[in-house]
Amino acid sequence: MRLHYLLRLLSFAFLWFILRSFLVKYLNFFTLGFFFCFSSTPRNFAYLVALFMLCLSTFSAFSNLTLFSWAKYSKLSLGSNVSNSTVVESSYISVIAPFFKIGFTLLSLLSLSPSSLSESNPCQDSSDSTCKSSVLSFFASSISASKFKLSLNVFNCSSITSLRSCRIFCLSSIFLSLSCSLINSCAFFCL
């Protein structure tokens, strides 16, 4: 009965991480790429979208902390062969990583001039280099964040091998991270 409950919880965590990966990574690419540089959307709307992404990244950091705290407790209860230091170390890394993305998003927000938020998108003008540089810096931060997440997933897959569901989840996360990293890399070099 307890194993059945644990498997259901792992399945819910698997679906949640897929949804979160789509929201945090793909939404970052499409919103800042389309609304911020490739359309005539006013900058105040792009500013609100960036703030929404900032909230998602913050929620992602605290959800990682909650999930890995639960994982630490469950592994201690089940008597897994994964050491406590491994679980604690991976939890701290998973919480620190989204905060780097939060910092890069804040830098992108600060690069927007508050006096021109109500104007049309200045990226339509090819002579404006401020918006272009901020978008390029955001794509560069997305590339580094994806690679950091990829290395973290490889670390988790090599350490958590007791449950089949954990391995399936880790491999799926690696595939998503590779896909996001390739998309961000292509967007960075095409701009």
Curated annotation (Swiss-Prot):
This is Putative uncharacterized protein YDR413C. It comes from Saccharomyces cerevisiae (strain ATCC 204508 / S288c) (Baker's yeast). Partially overlaps YDR412W. It comes from the Eukaryota. GO terms for cellular component: membrane. It is a multi-pass membrane protein. Keywords: Membrane, Transmembrane, Transmembrane helix. It is found in: Membrane. Its main location: membrane. The chain crosses the membrane at residues 12-32, 48-68, 92-112, 168-188.
